Amino acid sequence: MTLLNSYFGSFGGMYVPQILMPALYQLESEFVLSLKNLQFKKKLANLLKNYAGRPTPLTLCRNLTKGTNTRIYLKREDLLHGGAHKTNQVLGQALLAKQMKKKEIIAETGAGQHGVAAALSCALLNLKCRIYMGIKDIERQKQNVFRMKLMGAQVIPVKSGNGTLKDACNEALRDWSENYINAHYMLGTAAGPHPYPTIVKQFQSVIGKETKQQIFEKEHCLPNSVIACVGGGSNAIGIFSSFIEDTSVNLIGVEPGGIGIHTEKHGASLICGETGIFFGMKSKVMQTHEGQIKESWSISAGLDFPAVGPEHAWLDSIKRVTYVSITDSEAVHAFQHLSKLEGIIPALESSHALAYAIKLMNNYPNKNQTLIVNISGRGDKDLKTVEKFLNK
């Protein structure tokens, strides 16, 4: 029996080989204890403040919105140490691993941001680290691969399947099933088997807590909308968590539309997927009629995933969050637009959320509206990808 509810409505669960159940129960037990442990909380708060650089600012876009009545604020997770929101939860998981007396960390990565965050947390806390990464992602994220290796991590190329995040996840789980006694699997998003979606949400909820306090200080009221990109869904659930009960706030999750959701080349699992079992969970998954997992597609490596975290599937089913899609070209345009007008280069993942905010602004230029966009990471890693896309 689990200590916490392992489902969000009908989504979630622990669909893993029996051999991994003791490791998941141990992790859940340690997590529950940590929530009551003042020393653990102090350690994590200290690392977030003095190592990662929290709180991150909430920045008003003054040039982007000129000539409209829209106010767009950016939650600046791009300024966090490591370059993305991923650092928030890896520090929490690394501390849990230390408490469980684990010596090694296993991780997966797509865009490389979770890999970088895992590597830096392991360097800091003296843990061995091996990271699985698809060969397609290694090719498009060479800078992050070098950063991981520089911090002492072993990067293991995954050649199976399409050589992307899905395949890296499968290999990481396979490794963990053989080495769970000494190793902790540091999952990178709010997906996978229970208790991972709950753990990752807890450690990413700092984004939403800060944002809510900051927007009240600046506007003295709640925003009209909070917008975040959704791949696995950790940055989105992190910022949404503080606003879910505020029903006047529109929560908008932006999925990767790729070349278009009418094609086979996209990653919009909530919009186009069906309920299925994948990666140890029941959620919305891109699959064939026979139940085979489809290959996802996105210009953004971090969104190139054929499923979504179970809480997002539940929030979609109860219509608390609206899920939309943005194409590769729309995301690249937003990437250029913010860079040119505000001097902020966002990650391609975050550019999907930004593109939808720009769409709302352009569709309702005279409407008084306050939008918050979670800039989940910085775009240095994507410069070559964007350059290649623009030179096509």
Swiss-Prot record:
Protein name from the UniProt record: Tryptophan synthase beta chain
GO cellular component: cytoplasm
Listed cofactors: pyridoxal 5'-phosphate
First-tier enzyme category under EC: lyase
UniProt keywords, alphabetically: Amino-acid biosynthesis, Aromatic amino acid biosynthesis, Lyase, Pyridoxal phosphate, Tryptophan biosynthesis
InterPro entries associated with the record: Trp_synth_b_CS, Trp_synth_beta, Trp_synth_beta/beta-like, TrpB-like_PALP, TrpB-like_PALP_sf
Family named by the database record: Belongs to the TrpB family.
Function: The beta subunit is responsible for the synthesis of L-tryptophan from indole and L-serine.
NCBIfam families according to UniProt: trpB
Subunit description: Tetramer of two alpha and two beta chains.
Molecular function GO labels: tryptophan synthase activity
Recorded catalytic activity of this chain's protein: (1S,2R)-1-C-(indol-3-yl)glycerol 3-phosphate + L-serine = D-glyceraldehyde 3-phosphate + L-tryptophan + H2O
Positions bearing N6-(pyridoxal phosphate)lysine: 86
Lineage: Bacteria, Pseudomonadati, Pseudomonadota, Gammaproteobacteria, Enterobacterales
Keyword Lyase assigned: yes
EC number annotated for this UniProt entry: 4.2.1.20
